[in-house]
């Protein structure tokens, strides 16, 4: 019984402080590919240069992009690594889910 309880407790603790999202587009290539799984730390504290997860406006899903600049109130200007220009507007601090801490390159193996 212990062999089951400990891993389940560890996973519950992990997902209390972390989340996971699957990359769906190519805007972060070559850093991340469609199908890759990103684990992120649930915090609004992101720094310029970090890959982060944020909510689209009106709850339309999650986006994985790089933080280009972070303002004094935590608002973030973002950009996909494959994009030549930054995303329009800024991401309000309330929509930031957190920085990516681990990226699992699942998409690179599944697509081939």
Ranges and model annotations:
Residues 1-112:
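Extended hydrophobic leader/signal-anchor segments used for secretion and membrane insertion
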